[in-house]
């Protein structure tokens, strides 16, 4: 359930809906896409839209170029051969859909979403399930589309992906918006907060602290009183992912 969610996406930017499982990012994206009804509020979408769903699928025996032709006919548009070439569709054009790798399926569905040269793209977990090579390839395509002036709204749970691709992000927790802005603004929101990583004979632990000197003294005294030996201690101002976990109350994996 979404609760008072409000944000806007600027023309030509890559904007991420970020959150853990169940945070509401896919629900929010489906509302924007018109795939889910909402009880109150209003959504304005300005421009032609292309959609890539996380759970997209096609008939098992259809071939990529046949799928492109059919979708183009249904939507009364022409397929752009340059786009198909840029996405590498021709390299697996002779395969049936059931024979395609996850990465090839993602590229095919992105090609289908781009039919008709939409001004806006909605991508739901575009790199979920891809290996490193597939992720790098799809990230490259998203950057190319941004350079061409596309406005892209994507849902993701991957902070590294968001940091690499997006101009701004909205963080959702339990259906509510807890942050909206740039990655730099998210870091600044945490102020001077430090991350203290402590390695003991019983395992590793991490803590957040505003006053690092006092916090370290308190932590070390606490371990001493418990009779736990501290083997190593490190401090830093925290990664973007750590700021995200702090904001959403998630535990580091």
Task: Say what each PLM segment does.
Residues 121-125:
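Catalytic Walker B motif of ABC-type/P-loop ATPase nucleotide-binding domains
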Residues 162-164:
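A short, surface-exposed alpha-helical micro-motif characterized by mixed small hydrophobic
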Residues 185-253:
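Short, charged/small-residue-rich alpha-helical element at the C-terminal edge
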Residues 50, 69, 78-93:
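Conserved ABC ATPase "signature" region
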Residues 33:
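Helix-to-loop junction immediately C-terminal to a conserved catalytic motif
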């Amino acid at each position: 359930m979404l609760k008072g969610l409000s944000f806007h996406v600027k023309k030509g930017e890559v904007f991420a809906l970020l959150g853990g499982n169940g945070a509401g990012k896919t629900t929010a994206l489906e509302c924007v896409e018109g795939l889910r009804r909402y009880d109150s509020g209003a959504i304005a979408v300005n421009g032609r839209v292309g959609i890539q769903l996380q759970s997209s699928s096609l008939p098992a025996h259809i071939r990529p170029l046949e799928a492109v032709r059919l979708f183009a006919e249904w939507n009364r548009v022409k397929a752009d051969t340059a786009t198909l070439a840029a996405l590498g569709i021709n390299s697996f054009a002779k395969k049936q859909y059931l024979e395609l790798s996850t990465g090839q399926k993602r590229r095919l569905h992105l090609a289908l979403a781009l039919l008709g040269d939409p001004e806006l793209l909605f991508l739901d977990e575009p790199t979920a399930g891809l290996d490193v090579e597939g992720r790098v390839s799809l990230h490259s395509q998203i950057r190319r589309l941004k350079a061409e002036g596309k406005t892209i709204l994507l849902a993701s749970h991957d902070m590294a992906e968001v940091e690499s691709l997006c101009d701004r992000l909205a963080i959702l927790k339990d259906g509510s918006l807890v942050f909206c802005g740039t990655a730099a603004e998210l870091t600044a929101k945490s102020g001077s907060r430090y991350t203290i990583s402590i390695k003991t004979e019983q395992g590793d632990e991490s803590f957040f602290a505003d006053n690092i000197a006092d916090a370290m003294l308190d932590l070390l005294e606490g371990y001493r009183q418990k009779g736990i030996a501290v083997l190593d201690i490190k401090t830093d101002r925290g990664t973007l992912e750590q700021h995200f976990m702090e904001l959403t109350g998630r535990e580091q994996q």
